C-alpha cells in the first residue's frame, strides 16, 4: 500500500477475500434476518434460513480445504458466525416463548463465561489456545438439533406424537451438555491448559 497501511486483501500472508470467507460472512449477515423472522412469527422461513446456514457452514469448510487450506480469517470468523446464529436463535426463540427462557440464559451464560475467561487470561498475559473439546462439539450438535426442531415445530405445526418427547429430551440434553462443556472449559483453564 502506498501509505504504508495494512493491505486489506492480505493479512499476515492470508487472503481476506476468498469464496469460503464470503460464504461465512454471508452467514454472519443472515443472523439479523433470522432474528427478525422469528420475532415476526415466521418460524418456517427461519427454519429454512437456519438449514441454509448449516449447509453454507459445510460448504465453506469443504471449499476452504479444497482450495488449499483454511484461512486465518476463516478460522476466526467461522465459529463467530456459528455462535452468533445459535445464541441469537436461543434468545429469540425464548423471547417468543418457543423455548424455555432458563435454557437460553444457561446457553448465553456458558458462552459469556468462556469468552470472559479467555479475555481475563489474555489480560493476565497467559497464552490462550482455543481448542474445541469433544463435549463442546457434542453440545453444539445438540443445540443445532434443538433449534432446528423448535423452528420446524413452530413453523409447520408438528406438535404432539413423537416430536414433543424428542424436544423435551433434546432440551435436557442441551442443558446437561451446556453445563458439562462449560465446566470442562473452566477446568481446563484452571489447570493451565
Segments from the language model and where they lie:
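Alpha-helical transmembrane bundles and membrane-interface segments of multipass inner-membrane proteins
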Residues: 1-193
Amino acid at each position: 500500500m502506498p501509505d504504508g497501511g495494512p493491505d486489506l486483501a492480505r493479512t499476515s500472508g492470508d487472503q481476506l477475500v476468498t469464496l469460503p470467507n464470503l460464504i461465512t460472512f454471508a452467514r454472519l449477515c443472515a443472523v439479523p434476518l433470522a432474528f427478525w423472522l422469528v420475532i415476526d412469527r415466521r418460524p418456517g422461513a427461519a427454519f429454512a434460513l437456519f438449514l441454509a446456514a448449516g449447509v453454507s457452514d459445510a460448504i465453506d469448510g469443504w471449499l476452504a480445504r479444497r482450495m488449499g487450506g483454511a484461512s486465518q480469517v476463516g478460522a476466526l470468523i467461522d465459529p463467530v458466525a456459528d455462535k452468533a446464529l445459535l445464541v441469537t436463535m436461543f434468545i429469540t426463540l425464548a423471547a417468543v416463548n418457543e423455548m424455555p427462557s432458563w435454557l437460553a440464559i444457561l446457553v448465553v451464560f456458558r458462552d459469556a463465561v468462556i469468552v470472559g475467561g479467555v479475555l481475563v487470561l489474555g489480560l493476565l498475559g497467559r497464552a490462550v489456545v482455543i481448542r474445541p473439546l469433544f463435549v463442546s462439539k457434542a453440545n453444539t450438535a445438540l443445540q443445532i438439533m434443538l433449534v432446528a426442531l423448535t423452528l420446524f415445530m413452530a413453523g409447520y405445526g408438528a406438535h404432539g406424537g413423537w416430536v414433543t418427547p424428542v424436544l423435551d429430551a433434546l432440551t435436557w440434553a442441551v442443558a446437561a451438555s451446556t453445563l458439562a462443556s462449560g465446566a470442562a472449559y473452566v477446568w481446563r483453564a484452571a489447570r493451565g491448559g
